[in-house]
Protein backbone atom coordinates (compact mmCIF):
# COMPACT_ATOMS: atom_id res chain seq x y z
CA UNK A 1 0.00 0.00 0.00
CA UNK A 2 2.84 2.39 0.90
CA UNK A 3 4.59 1.56 -2.38
CA UNK A 4 1.40 2.35 -4.30
CA UNK A 5 1.09 5.71 -2.56
CA UNK A 6 4.69 6.62 -3.41
CA UNK A 7 4.19 5.55 -7.04
CA UNK A 8 0.98 7.61 -7.26
CA UNK A 9 2.72 10.71 -5.88
CA UNK A 10 5.63 10.32 -8.30
CA UNK A 11 3.22 9.89 -11.23
CA UNK A 12 1.26 12.97 -10.18
CA UNK A 13 4.36 15.13 -9.85
CA UNK A 14 5.91 14.03 -13.15
CA UNK A 15 2.61 14.37 -15.03
CA UNK A 16 1.84 17.81 -13.57
CA UNK A 17 5.42 18.99 -14.18
CA UNK A 18 5.61 17.70 -17.76
CA UNK A 19 2.20 18.80 -19.04
CA UNK A 20 2.97 22.56 -19.31
CA UNK A 21 5.98 21.77 -21.53
CA UNK A 22 3.78 19.58 -23.73
CA UNK A 23 1.22 22.40 -24.04
CA UNK A 24 3.92 24.97 -24.78
CA UNK A 25 5.49 22.73 -27.45
CA UNK A 26 2.06 22.29 -29.03
CA UNK A 27 1.52 26.04 -29.13
CA UNK A 28 5.02 26.95 -30.36
CA UNK A 29 4.76 24.51 -33.25
CA UNK A 30 1.28 25.91 -34.02
CA UNK A 31 -0.12 22.42 -34.28
CA UNK A 32 -3.85 22.28 -35.06
CA UNK A 33 -5.91 21.50 -31.97
CA UNK A 34 -9.26 20.07 -31.02
CA UNK A 35 -12.22 20.60 -33.34
CA UNK A 36 -15.55 21.45 -31.72
CA UNK A 37 -19.25 20.70 -32.28
CA UNK A 38 -20.94 23.72 -33.84
CA UNK A 39 -24.23 22.72 -32.16
CA UNK A 40 -22.77 23.47 -28.72
CA UNK A 41 -21.87 27.13 -29.21
CA UNK A 42 -20.15 27.50 -25.84
CA UNK A 43 -17.55 25.00 -27.07
CA UNK A 44 -16.53 26.96 -30.17
CA UNK A 45 -14.10 29.08 -28.15
CA UNK A 46 -12.13 25.90 -27.36
CA UNK A 47 -11.24 25.27 -31.00
CA UNK A 48 -7.49 24.92 -31.32
CA UNK A 49 -6.94 23.81 -27.71
CA UNK A 50 -3.99 21.38 -27.58
CA UNK A 51 -5.01 17.74 -27.55
CA UNK A 52 -3.22 14.37 -27.27
CA UNK A 53 -2.40 15.15 -23.63
CA UNK A 54 -3.10 11.49 -22.97
CA UNK A 55 0.30 10.76 -24.48
CA UNK A 56 1.94 12.35 -21.45
CA UNK A 57 -0.03 10.69 -18.66
CA UNK A 58 0.09 7.28 -20.38
CA UNK A 59 3.88 7.45 -20.75
CA UNK A 60 4.25 8.60 -17.14
CA UNK A 61 1.96 5.93 -15.68
CA UNK A 62 3.51 3.17 -17.80
CA UNK A 63 7.10 4.16 -17.00
CA UNK A 64 6.51 4.54 -13.25
CA UNK A 65 4.55 1.26 -13.07
CA UNK A 66 7.27 -0.68 -14.88
CA UNK A 67 10.15 0.85 -12.91
CA UNK A 68 8.54 0.33 -9.51
CA UNK A 69 7.39 -3.19 -10.44
CA UNK A 70 10.79 -4.30 -11.70
CA UNK A 71 12.56 -3.10 -8.56
CA UNK A 72 9.97 -4.18 -5.98
CA UNK A 73 7.98 -7.15 -7.32
CA UNK A 74 9.86 -10.44 -7.63
CA UNK A 75 6.85 -12.66 -8.31
CA UNK A 76 6.88 -13.49 -12.04
CA UNK A 77 3.11 -14.06 -12.02
CA UNK A 78 2.52 -10.56 -10.67
CA UNK A 79 4.88 -9.05 -13.24
CA UNK A 80 3.05 -10.93 -16.00
CA UNK A 81 -0.28 -9.56 -14.77
CA UNK A 82 1.00 -5.98 -14.73
CA UNK A 83 2.59 -6.35 -18.16
CA UNK A 84 -0.67 -7.81 -19.47
CA UNK A 85 -2.75 -4.84 -18.37
CA UNK A 86 -0.10 -2.37 -19.50
CA UNK A 87 0.09 -4.06 -22.90
CA UNK A 88 -3.57 -3.39 -23.69
CA UNK A 89 -3.17 0.19 -22.42
CA UNK A 90 -0.19 0.75 -24.72
CA UNK A 91 -1.83 -0.94 -27.72
CA UNK A 92 -5.01 1.11 -27.45
CA UNK A 93 -2.96 4.21 -26.74
CA UNK A 94 -1.12 3.66 -30.03
CA UNK A 95 -4.43 3.24 -31.87
CA UNK A 96 -5.69 6.49 -30.36
CA UNK A 97 -2.40 8.23 -31.13
CA UNK A 98 -2.66 7.20 -34.78
CA UNK A 99 -6.24 8.47 -34.93
CA UNK A 100 -5.26 11.81 -33.37
CA UNK A 101 -2.18 12.08 -35.58
CA UNK A 102 -4.22 11.71 -38.77
CA UNK A 103 -6.74 14.32 -37.59
CA UNK A 104 -4.23 16.91 -36.43
CA UNK A 105 -1.02 16.48 -38.41
CA UNK A 106 -2.44 15.09 -41.65
CA UNK A 107 -5.63 17.19 -41.49
CA UNK A 108 -7.82 14.13 -42.12
CA UNK A 109 -11.01 15.19 -40.34
CA UNK A 110 -12.29 11.77 -39.30
CA UNK A 111 -8.85 10.31 -38.58
CA UNK A 112 -9.09 6.55 -38.83
CA UNK A 113 -12.32 5.36 -40.42
CA UNK A 114 -14.74 3.47 -38.16
CA UNK A 115 -13.81 0.18 -39.85
CA UNK A 116 -10.07 0.83 -39.55
CA UNK A 117 -10.37 1.73 -35.88
CA UNK A 118 -12.54 -1.30 -35.09
CA UNK A 119 -10.15 -3.63 -36.94
CA UNK A 120 -7.18 -2.31 -34.95
CA UNK A 121 -9.11 -2.50 -31.67
CA UNK A 122 -10.12 -6.11 -32.37
CA UNK A 123 -6.53 -6.97 -33.27
CA UNK A 124 -5.34 -5.42 -30.00
CA UNK A 125 -8.01 -7.29 -28.08
CA UNK A 126 -6.97 -10.58 -29.68
CA UNK A 127 -3.34 -9.98 -28.73
CA UNK A 128 -4.37 -9.25 -25.14
CA UNK A 129 -6.50 -12.40 -24.98
CA UNK A 130 -4.02 -14.87 -26.47
CA UNK A 131 -0.93 -13.47 -24.74
CA UNK A 132 -2.34 -12.74 -21.29
CA UNK A 133 -5.90 -14.03 -20.73
CA UNK A 134 -5.86 -17.44 -22.40
CA UNK A 135 -2.63 -18.63 -20.67
CA UNK A 136 -4.27 -17.95 -17.29
CA UNK A 137 -7.00 -20.47 -18.09
CA UNK A 138 -9.84 -18.03 -17.38
CA UNK A 139 -12.99 -18.87 -19.33
CA UNK A 140 -15.82 -17.82 -17.01
CA UNK A 141 -17.44 -14.60 -15.81
CA UNK A 142 -17.99 -13.92 -12.13
CA UNK A 143 -21.60 -12.73 -11.77
CA UNK A 144 -22.50 -11.92 -8.15
CA UNK A 145 -20.22 -14.73 -6.98
CA UNK A 146 -21.55 -17.25 -9.50
CA UNK A 147 -19.10 -18.49 -12.15
CA UNK A 148 -20.75 -18.42 -15.57
CA UNK A 149 -18.62 -20.64 -17.80
CA UNK A 150 -18.32 -19.40 -21.39
CA UNK A 151 -15.62 -21.70 -22.71
CA UNK A 152 -14.27 -20.51 -26.05
CA UNK A 153 -16.93 -17.78 -26.11
CA UNK A 154 -15.00 -16.00 -23.36
CA UNK A 155 -12.77 -14.75 -26.18
CA UNK A 156 -15.73 -12.90 -27.72
CA UNK A 157 -16.67 -11.50 -24.32
CA UNK A 158 -13.15 -10.11 -23.82
CA UNK A 159 -13.21 -8.49 -27.26
CA UNK A 160 -16.65 -6.98 -26.64
CA UNK A 161 -15.63 -5.76 -23.18
CA UNK A 162 -12.34 -4.15 -24.15
CA UNK A 163 -13.51 -2.62 -27.44
CA UNK A 164 -16.85 -1.54 -25.98
CA UNK A 165 -15.50 0.27 -22.94
CA UNK A 166 -12.60 1.85 -24.80
CA UNK A 167 -15.11 3.47 -27.15
CA UNK A 168 -17.45 4.31 -24.27
CA UNK A 169 -14.78 6.31 -22.43
CA UNK A 170 -13.91 7.94 -25.75
CA UNK A 171 -17.53 9.15 -26.07
CA UNK A 172 -17.44 10.43 -22.48
CA UNK A 173 -14.44 12.65 -23.21
CA UNK A 174 -16.48 15.58 -24.52
CA UNK A 175 -16.28 18.34 -21.92
CA UNK A 176 -13.54 19.67 -19.66
CA UNK A 177 -12.50 17.20 -16.98
CA UNK A 178 -15.43 14.81 -17.37
CA UNK A 179 -13.62 11.70 -18.57
CA UNK A 180 -10.46 12.18 -16.49
CA UNK A 181 -12.23 12.38 -13.12
CA UNK A 182 -14.85 9.79 -14.08
CA UNK A 183 -12.01 7.35 -14.74
CA UNK A 184 -10.29 8.35 -11.49
CA UNK A 185 -13.51 7.50 -9.61
CA UNK A 186 -13.67 4.12 -11.37
CA UNK A 187 -10.00 3.41 -10.66
CA UNK A 188 -10.32 4.32 -6.99
CA UNK A 189 -13.18 1.83 -6.71
CA UNK A 190 -11.17 -0.92 -8.38
CA UNK A 191 -8.27 0.05 -6.13
CA UNK A 192 -10.43 -0.76 -3.09
CA UNK A 193 -11.43 -4.11 -4.64
CA UNK A 194 -7.81 -4.93 -5.48
CA UNK A 195 -6.73 -4.05 -1.92
CA UNK A 196 -9.41 -6.27 -0.36
CA UNK A 197 -8.45 -9.13 -2.69
CA UNK A 198 -4.78 -8.66 -1.82
CA UNK A 199 -3.87 -7.98 -5.45
CA UNK A 200 -1.28 -5.32 -4.68
CA UNK A 201 0.29 -5.63 -8.12
CA UNK A 202 -2.95 -4.42 -9.74
CA UNK A 203 -3.29 -1.81 -6.99
CA UNK A 204 0.15 -0.44 -7.88
CA UNK A 205 -0.86 -0.05 -11.51
CA UNK A 206 -4.12 1.63 -10.53
CA UNK A 207 -2.33 4.03 -8.19
CA UNK A 208 0.16 5.18 -10.81
CA UNK A 209 -2.60 5.89 -13.33
CA UNK A 210 -4.65 7.79 -10.74
CA UNK A 211 -1.62 9.95 -9.95
CA UNK A 212 -0.87 10.61 -13.63
CA UNK A 213 -4.52 11.44 -14.36
CA UNK A 214 -4.75 13.89 -11.46
CA UNK A 215 -1.60 15.60 -12.73
CA UNK A 216 -3.28 15.87 -16.14
CA UNK A 217 -6.52 17.17 -14.57
CA UNK A 218 -4.63 20.20 -13.23
CA UNK A 219 -4.67 21.41 -16.85
CA UNK A 220 -7.84 19.68 -18.07
CA UNK A 221 -10.42 21.19 -15.70
CA UNK A 222 -12.53 24.06 -17.01
CA UNK A 223 -11.24 26.07 -18.79
CA UNK A 224 -9.15 23.23 -20.18
CA UNK A 225 -5.67 24.03 -21.42
CA UNK A 226 -5.30 20.56 -22.93
CA UNK A 227 -7.48 17.58 -23.88
CA UNK A 228 -6.49 13.92 -23.58
CA UNK A 229 -7.44 13.00 -27.15
CA UNK A 230 -8.23 9.50 -28.40
CA UNK A 231 -4.76 8.42 -27.31
CA UNK A 232 -5.88 8.87 -23.70
CA UNK A 233 -9.56 7.93 -23.77
CA UNK A 234 -9.25 4.70 -25.77
CA UNK A 235 -6.40 3.50 -23.54
CA UNK A 236 -8.24 4.33 -20.31
CA UNK A 237 -11.39 2.48 -21.38
CA UNK A 238 -9.37 -0.59 -22.33
CA UNK A 239 -7.53 -0.39 -19.01
CA UNK A 240 -10.77 -0.40 -17.00
CA UNK A 241 -12.00 -3.44 -18.94
CA UNK A 242 -8.69 -5.26 -18.42
CA UNK A 243 -8.67 -4.50 -14.68
CA UNK A 244 -12.24 -5.78 -14.25
CA UNK A 245 -11.14 -9.01 -15.97
CA UNK A 246 -7.93 -9.29 -13.92
CA UNK A 247 -9.86 -8.86 -10.65
CA UNK A 248 -12.54 -11.35 -11.82
CA UNK A 249 -15.22 -8.72 -11.26
CA UNK A 250 -16.29 -8.10 -14.85
CA UNK A 251 -19.94 -7.38 -14.05
CA UNK A 252 -19.02 -4.50 -11.76
CA UNK A 253 -17.87 -2.35 -14.68
CA UNK A 254 -21.46 -2.03 -15.88
CA UNK A 255 -22.25 -0.20 -12.63
CA UNK A 256 -18.89 1.40 -11.79
CA UNK A 257 -18.79 2.59 -15.39
CA UNK A 258 -22.42 3.73 -15.44
CA UNK A 259 -21.40 7.13 -16.87
CA UNK A 260 -19.74 5.48 -19.87
CA UNK A 261 -22.74 3.17 -20.29
CA UNK A 262 -25.12 6.16 -20.22
CA UNK A 263 -23.06 8.07 -22.77
CA UNK A 264 -22.86 5.11 -25.16
CA UNK A 265 -26.50 4.10 -24.72
CA UNK A 266 -27.65 7.64 -25.49
CA UNK A 267 -25.83 7.56 -28.84
CA UNK A 268 -27.17 4.12 -29.74
CA UNK A 269 -30.74 5.04 -28.79
CA UNK A 270 -30.58 8.34 -30.64
CA UNK A 271 -29.31 6.79 -33.87
CA UNK A 272 -31.74 3.85 -33.72
CA UNK A 273 -34.77 6.02 -32.94
CA UNK A 274 -33.84 8.55 -35.63
CA UNK A 275 -33.59 5.82 -38.28
CA UNK A 276 -36.82 4.16 -37.12
CA UNK A 277 -38.87 7.38 -37.14
CA UNK A 278 -37.42 8.47 -40.47
CA UNK A 279 -38.49 5.18 -42.01
CA UNK A 280 -41.94 5.24 -40.38
CA UNK A 281 -42.85 8.95 -40.51
CA UNK A 282 -40.60 10.23 -43.27
CA UNK A 283 -38.59 12.39 -40.88
CA UNK A 284 -36.08 11.52 -38.21
CA UNK A 285 -36.95 12.32 -34.60
CA UNK A 286 -34.71 12.52 -31.56
CA UNK A 287 -34.95 11.37 -27.96
CA UNK A 288 -32.15 13.64 -26.72
CA UNK A 289 -31.31 17.21 -27.63
CA UNK A 290 -27.88 16.00 -28.62
CA UNK A 291 -25.67 13.02 -27.90
CA UNK A 292 -23.56 11.85 -26.15
CA UNK A 293 -25.64 12.45 -23.02
CA UNK A 294 -23.42 15.17 -21.55
CA UNK A 295 -24.33 17.44 -24.50
CA UNK A 296 -28.04 16.82 -23.82
CA UNK A 297 -27.49 18.04 -20.26
CA UNK A 298 -25.60 21.10 -21.49
CA UNK A 299 -28.38 22.11 -23.86
CA UNK A 300 -31.31 21.75 -21.46
CA UNK A 301 -30.65 19.83 -18.26
CA UNK A 302 -32.08 16.38 -17.55
CA UNK A 303 -35.37 17.05 -19.34
CA UNK A 304 -33.63 18.67 -22.28
CA UNK A 305 -36.13 21.52 -22.05
CA UNK A 306 -34.85 23.38 -19.00
CA UNK A 307 -32.08 25.91 -18.52
CA UNK A 308 -28.73 25.15 -20.06
CA UNK A 309 -26.27 23.54 -17.69
CA UNK A 310 -22.71 24.80 -17.39
CA UNK A 311 -19.88 22.34 -17.88
CA UNK A 312 -19.23 22.36 -14.14
CA UNK A 313 -22.86 21.39 -13.50
CA UNK A 314 -22.67 18.54 -16.00
CA UNK A 315 -19.35 17.39 -14.53
CA UNK A 316 -20.64 17.51 -10.96
CA UNK A 317 -23.82 15.61 -11.87
CA UNK A 318 -22.09 12.82 -13.78
CA UNK A 319 -19.23 12.55 -11.28
CA UNK A 320 -21.89 12.23 -8.58
CA UNK A 321 -23.69 9.50 -10.52
CA UNK A 322 -20.41 7.65 -11.00
CA UNK A 323 -19.50 7.98 -7.32
CA UNK A 324 -22.88 6.71 -6.10
CA UNK A 325 -22.74 3.78 -8.52
CA UNK A 326 -19.25 2.90 -7.30
CA UNK A 327 -20.36 3.01 -3.67
CA UNK A 328 -23.27 0.73 -4.59
CA UNK A 329 -20.86 -1.85 -6.02
CA UNK A 330 -18.69 -1.76 -2.90
CA UNK A 331 -21.80 -2.14 -0.75
CA UNK A 332 -22.96 -5.15 -2.79
CA UNK A 333 -19.54 -6.78 -2.57
CA UNK A 334 -18.65 -6.11 1.05
CA UNK A 335 -21.73 -5.04 3.02
CA UNK A 336 -24.85 -6.86 1.86
From Swiss-Prot:
Gene Ontology annotations of biological process type: cell division; cell wall organization; peptidoglycan biosynthetic process; regulation of cell shape
GO cellular component terms, A-Z: plasma membrane
Pathway entry: Cell wall biogenesis; peptidoglycan biosynthesis
Pfam families in the cross-refs: Glycos_transf_4, MraY_sig1
Keyword Magnesium (UniProt): yes
Residue ranges crossing the lipid bilayer per the database entry: 3-23, 53-73, 78-98, 118-138, 143-163, 174-194, 200-220, 226-246, 251-271, 316-336
Cofactor entry: Mg(2+)
Enzyme class name: transferase
Membrane topology: Multi-pass membrane protein
Keywords noted in UniProt: Cell cycle, Cell division, Cell membrane, Cell shape, Cell wall biogenesis/degradation, Magnesium, Membrane, Metal-binding, Peptidoglycan synthesis, Transferase, Transmembrane, Transmembrane helix
Annotated compartments: Cell membrane
Keyword Zinc-finger tagged: no
Main subcellular localisation: membrane
Catalysed conversion reaction: UDP-N-acetyl-alpha-D-muramoyl-L-alanyl-gamma-D-glutamyl-L-lysyl-D-alanyl-D-alanine + di-trans,octa-cis-undecaprenyl phosphate = Mur2Ac(oyl-L-Ala-gamma-D-Glu-L-Lys-D-Ala-D-Ala)-di-trans,octa-cis-undecaprenyl diphosphate + UMP
EC code: 2.7.8.13
MF terms (GO), sorted A to Z: metal ion binding; phospho-N-acetylmuramoyl-pentapeptide-transferase activity
Function, as annotated: Catalyzes the initial step of the lipid cycle reactions in the biosynthesis of the cell wall peptidoglycan: transfers peptidoglycan precursor phospho-MurNAc-pentapeptide from UDP-MurNAc-pentapeptide onto the lipid carrier undecaprenyl phosphate, yielding undecaprenyl-pyrophosphoryl-MurNAc-pentapeptide, known as lipid I.
Annotated family: Belongs to the glycosyltransferase 4 family. MraY subfamily.
HAMAP family: MraY
Record's protein name: Phospho-N-acetylmuramoyl-pentapeptide-transferase
Source organism of this protein record: Streptococcus pyogenes serotype M4 (strain MGAS10750)
Amino acid sequence: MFLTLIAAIISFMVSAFTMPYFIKFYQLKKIGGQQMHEDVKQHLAKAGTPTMGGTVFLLVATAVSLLVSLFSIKNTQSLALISGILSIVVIYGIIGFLDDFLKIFKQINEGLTAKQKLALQLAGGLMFYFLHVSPSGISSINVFGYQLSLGIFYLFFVLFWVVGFSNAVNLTDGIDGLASISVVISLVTYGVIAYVQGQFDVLLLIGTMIGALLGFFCFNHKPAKVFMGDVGSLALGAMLAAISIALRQEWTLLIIGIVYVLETSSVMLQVSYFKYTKKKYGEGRRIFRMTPFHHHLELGGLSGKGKKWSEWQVDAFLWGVGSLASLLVLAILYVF
